[in-house]
Amino acid sequence: MRLPREIGPIHFVGIGGIGMSGIAEVLCNLGYTVQGSDASESANVARLREKGIAISVGHKAENVAGADVVVVSTAIKRDNPELLAARAQRIPVVRRAEMLAELMRLKSCVAIAGTHGKTTTTSMVAALLDAGEFDPTVINGGIINAYGTNARLGAGEWMVVEADESDGTFLKLPADVAIVTNVDPEHLDHFKTFEAVQNAFRDFVENVPFYGFAVMCIDHPVVQALVGKIEDRRIITYGENPQADVRLLDLKPNGGASTFKVAFRDRKANTAHEIADLKLPMPGRHNALNATAAIAVAHELGLSDDTIRKALAGFGGVRRRFTKTGDWNGVSIIDDYGHHPVEIAAVLKAARESTKTKVIAVVQPHRFTRLQSLFEEFCTCFNDADAVIVAEVYPAGEAPIPGIDRDNFVLGLRAHGHREVIPLQESAALAGVVHSIAKPGDYVVLLGAGNITQWAYALPGELKALG
């Protein structure tokens, strides 16, 4: 039995969240009656309203009246009035991942997991399958520029989804094809230990059916170790590693783009194949690796070399992934979601490859607990930045932790040899600081998962106003 067509209304608590909004949009496009609520107005809320979805701002018990099912994410607290009302009225309450799993049961599915790179890789797989006329349904964790949204309903038999590991619910997703980009210590508030994180990713791959396959990056030592532990499943490895089944070769930066080739090795048939002259309109080794994962899936599903080559060259990117928001006096302003040390290092390396002048990083640390648990890593991930501007920690609902704040982070960076580290007193002061240190050709990269994206879009205009 699958999700009945006549069920509804389906009420989403926190419908404006990036994961929730995508599922709500696809359900709406499938013909289900969808409604929801969110704590505040947002671009996602506005977009869903344009599709005819009724959305209330603020959480109230009466919002769930008449609903047949209530969908919640892990961000919703147990004392949320809508959740309490749903349970009091015996309305079924399901987690976001459970509803996503119901949608996935309607299609053959590619699920993309990993500590970093999920959103970009999901977008790349979607772009390649689009080009191959698969017309996939897509549910992503970021806004795909080609769609102007993070979700779309396709008429084809395939679905491409981002698998969020943060709360462990990605293990509920019935994927036929799984991608694992990397595995790093993250979300330890849920998993408690890094060993538990690794075990979850192992289970994710082993959930793939015998007729499916997993694509795993063996440039990452933890993923390489996982490959050796997984039995009875078909694994396709990728990376620059000479042992990879799908190998990234001859990677060269080309301004804000990358060129490379990919070599395939079929161990069973003992054959080799190569796709040369690949161009990706994004900088950075990490993005080339993400593209290699997408190419591995596309090749396995039968796309031609020319289709892969053209689709990759035309890839439009993802919002908040090395997104240029504007420029001033020859200075490029970049917005990026990077908020983990591994992500920050990769983004700054890409910026370094894109300019011959300075890279100026502006970082808004995200969550006190993350800064505390990875403090040493944060102090050593800015090596490709000539200057680091540090904002206050974005709490994301957390209480402050003594000694874990902007000023101690500044001291930590200086203690690790950074010569120019500037504490930002308030967001309104950012334009003045950048104006005083940036020169033509420089890249100013704003990093974080909080509201720093708003600063990134405002900064070009503020700089122009200063002259």
From Swiss-Prot:
Top-level taxonomic group: Bacteria
What's one Pfam family here?
Answer: Mur_ligase_M
Please name the pathway: Cell wall biogenesis; peptidoglycan biosynthesis
Name where it's found.
Answer: Cytoplasm
UniProt catalytic activity:
UDP-N-acetyl-alpha-D-muramate + L-alanine + ATP = UDP-N-acetyl-alpha-D-muramoyl-L-alanine + ADP + phosphate + H(+)
Q: Top EC class per UniProt?
A: ligase
A GO CC term attached to the entry: cytoplasm
Single GO biological process annotation from the record: cell division
Q: Which keywords are on file for this protein?
A: ATP-binding, Cell cycle, Cell division, Cell shape, Cell wall biogenesis/degradation, Cytoplasm, Ligase, Nucleotide-binding, Peptidoglycan synthesis
What molecular function does GO assign, one term? ATP binding
According to its UniProt record, which protein family does this protein belong to? Belongs to the MurCDEF family.
- Record's protein name: UDP-N-acetylmuramate--L-alanine ligase
**Species the sequence originates in:** Rhodopseudomonas palustris (strain BisA53)
Give the lineage. Bacteria, Pseudomonadati, Pseudomonadota, Alphaproteobacteria, Hyphomicrobiales
